[in-house]
Amino acid sequence: MSSGYKPDILWSPHHADRYVICDTELSLYRIGPSGSSETKAGALQLSEETAATLLAINSDTPFMKCVAWYPKHEPECLLAVGHTNGRVVLTSLGQSHNSKSKDLAGKEFVPKHARQCNTLAWNPVDSNWLAAGLDKHRADFSVLIWDISSKFSPEAVPAEKVRLSGDADSGLLVTKPLYELGQNDACLSLCWLPRDHQKLLLAGMHRNLAIFDLRNTSQKTFVNTKAIQGVTVDPHFQDRVASYFEGQVAIWDLRKFEKPVFTLNEQPKPLTKVAWCPTRMGLLATLTRDSNIIRLYDMQHTPMPFGDEVEPTIMERGVQPCSESIISSFAWHPSAQNRMVVVSPSRVMNDFTLFERISLAWSSTTSLMWACGRHLYECAEDSGQAAEAEKDIATKMRERAQSRYGHDTVQVWRNHVLAGGDDPQLRSLWYTLHFMKQYTENVEQKQQSNKQSLIYSGIKNIVKSSSGTTETRRCWSGSDRQTDVPRFHSEERSLALQLCGWISQGPDTDVEPFLKSLEQEGEWERAAAVALFNLDIRRAIQILNKGASSEKGDLNLNVVAMALSGYTDEKNSLWREMCSSLRLQLKKPYLCIMFAFLTSEPGAYDGVLYESRVAVRDRVAFACMFLNDAQLPRYIDKLTNEMKEAGNLEGILLTGLTKDGVDLMESYVDRTGDVQTASFCMLKGSPGEVLKDPRVQCWIENYRNLLDAWRFWHKRAEFDIHRSKLDPSSKPLAQVFVSCNFCGKSISYSCSAMPHQGRGFSQYGVSGSPTKSKVTSCPGCRKPLPRCALCLMNMGTPVSSCPGTGKADEKADLTRDKKLAQFNNWFTWCHNCRHGGHAGHMLSWFRDHSECPVSACTCKCMQLDTTGNLVPSDSV
């Protein structure tokens, strides 16, 4: 540590609460909490929480140039002080006469020729060794290593050059150093290398850094550089050294000492101090002359390819401990993380802690963790009802994947229940796909292939193909008024009503089954509206009365039923006038559209068609019944565009699984991020050209990647199987073939051409039935296949049990399953050592072993795969 007339700080290496300020004198301070019993009345306030108390002063060092604190616990508070005349004096602060430092305090180490002492460094292991770096002298060495336990040698130096003063004790003078290095040069800075305490790193005036080994001082390793000031070793990376010249810092790696690893950005002013943080790896602090800012360089370690010389990432920032005061020096706290004390030229001190850079990390399961200093924090998600409603879409998709959402291909509508059953858009989507599937199966039975493709094209395309529409007029059922209401019928409109779920398949167009299902679900208002739209006002009143008397019914439904019973078709009646004005005040949308229908003119049903709170399927079904061939396509087109822009899944009923459906689903994914629903939906019945759409492929691949990230490998395999059934073109080609070692032909290809044998890998080693032959040799050249490393049987022989476990409960009869695709009989081998065998045997072996089962082979087969030791999340 260099001093001068500007204050410098030196922290005790073993006392976390003591430090020394040195300029023209040495002042020992103790730092502690403000207001504590140890803090005296005259303490200096360093921060809002800490204050410093002066313990001792030593004013006997007027020509002090540098100071170094003794590295061991005992003797306590022993310091070496280098002077401008080259002498090194040992002194202590605040010690009693009985302390161990009594014999060493006052001891002086005198060079042959007087010149300035620039730097001092204690050996961290042999603590009796003290290295001093001096200015150049043509007849003397610049680096002297003193042994503080050595005695005075009167014959070594003339007496007139030994004595410091007339009354000095000659027993305290040492003039013969233990080692002398660096002849005809100057030493500006030096440090001991922690990795080898016999080595010393010197920085000399001849612009070189040199490493000396005290066991052979005639040999040295050196490199030419201008950065020869302030050499210091990173305490957490002992091969990394920092040095500086003027405003530039060089970082060295002692293992590759030819040139600096990298240099930091040059500062406009000369540097005065550089120091590594003792509590944080790779954090370097620098200070420039006449500055109030300390610059910090955080050196990050990033993985890099072998052989590439890539500089590490450095994050630079500046801190300003004092608002306006110039900083003379600073010192890191030896144990408190990111804490330092700074001092100004007027000895004003400030204690502060740096804010740590925070690193955030999201896991694939949406858990959040962040690191701050030495602490790791995990963010726990609130499990309350509000948090349940605000779950991230990734969390929802993960939970749905665990419930096998999307995989029910028989009762397709149940998929919305697997998703939680609380999303009306998902409910509408899966019911739409369910009705499409039902009608498709009915068409297949009737062998009407021309209609099969029309079903999944959506109501928009179905309506456009409508022909032969007939208009009928029907009277109200259950009303005294015999007003005729016009309705429209066609085969395509009936198909649309079936897809909306209003009527069932077949010639019967009765809505009564649909009304009963709505009553069972407690949707009284919706059921009454559907009955009213089918011109059965008495049934609507009956449903409302039943709903009012139910356990959770609304008594106001009786009032609505009473209002319906007074229906009249007279345009100027009081009933019609009051219903038109008061219906908008009704909070329930289905009650509102009921009165809108009753008070509207034929063909002008905007109050029903554009009520956004009503389900799309009900509005579309109403339109198919009451709009003519000119009005219906216009309305469907307008509603389709609204659904596409909003990304509303109810619009799949209109678009179908077509390009318009992909556009709608794209808006939905952009809004929600739900690639899971998008993938399953598009696989249900889309034509080949839609499945080849890059957007659809992107959703599917992203969902597969999500399953892999969640370690749902079994579920991803299920999804791939599900996908290959619905989209045969997605089945990937075989990527691995087993070829014969003798003839080189593919065994699987040869076997696939053999009659009565099945295809591919599946038949190897599976007995199947007595009539099936075993494939234990190459079908091409009849040479035997390799042997299993454990059972020593030729591959193709069926496995019986898994040897190597030694536990009866772990053994299994692997031949009880007679399927040809039994996994335990498959070939498996290590890509490194090429040894292998039956998959079942290999799995059993590597449960208890890490090395290859072949004798004399030390290959760690299972550990070569980074995922070899991972456990699927869906099997935990």
Swiss-Prot record:
One of its GO terms (cellular component) is lysosomal membrane. Zn(2+) 3 binds at residues 830, 833, 861. One of its GO terms (biological process) is cellular response to nutrient levels. Zn(2+) 1 binds at residues 740, 743, 778, 781. WD repeats lie at residues 59-101, 112-156, 182-222, 224-262, 266-307, 400-440. This is GATOR2 complex protein MIOS. GO terms for molecular function: zinc ion binding. Component of the GATOR2 subcomplex, composed of MIOS, SEC13, SEH1L, WDR24 and WDR59. The GATOR2 complex interacts with CASTOR1 and CASTOR2; the interaction is negatively regulated by arginine. The GATOR2 complex interacts with SESN1, SESN2 and SESN3; the interaction is negatively regulated by amino acids. Interacts with SAR1; the interaction is direct, disrupted by leucine and mediates the interaction of SAR1 with the GATOR2 complex to negatively regulate the TORC1 signaling upon leucine deprivation. Zn(2+) 4 binds at residues 833, 835, 852, 857. The gene is mios. It is found in: Lysosome membrane. As a component of the GATOR2 complex, functions as an activator of the amino acid-sensing branch of the mTORC1 signaling pathway. The GATOR2 complex indirectly activates mTORC1 through the inhibition of the GATOR1 subcomplex. GATOR2 probably acts as an E3 ubiquitin-protein ligase toward GATOR1. In the presence of abundant amino acids, the GATOR2 complex mediates ubiquitination of the NPRL2 core component of the GATOR1 complex, leading to GATOR1 inactivation. In the absence of amino acids, GATOR2 is inhibited, activating the GATOR1 complex. InterPro entries: MIOS/Sea4 (IPR037593), MIOS_a-sol (IPR049092), WD40/YVTN_repeat-like_dom_sf (IPR015943), WD40_repeat_dom_sf (IPR036322), WD40_rpt (IPR001680), Zn_ribbon_mio (IPR031488). Gene3D superfamilies: YVTN repeat-like/Quinoprotein amine dehydrogenase (2.130.10.10). Zn(2+) 2 binds at residues 791, 838, 841. Belongs to the WD repeat mio family. Keywords: Lysosome, Membrane, Metal-binding, Repeat, WD repeat, Zinc, Zinc-finger. A zinc finger (RING-type) spans 785-866. The GATOR2 complex is negatively regulated by the upstream amino acid sensors CASTOR1 and SESN2, which sequester the GATOR2 complex in absence of amino acids. In the presence of abundant amino acids, GATOR2 is released from CASTOR1 and SESN2 and activated. PANTHER family: GATOR COMPLEX PROTEIN MIOS, WD40 DOMAIN-CONTAINING PROTEIN MIO FAMILY MEMBER. A zinc finger (C4-type) spans 738-784.
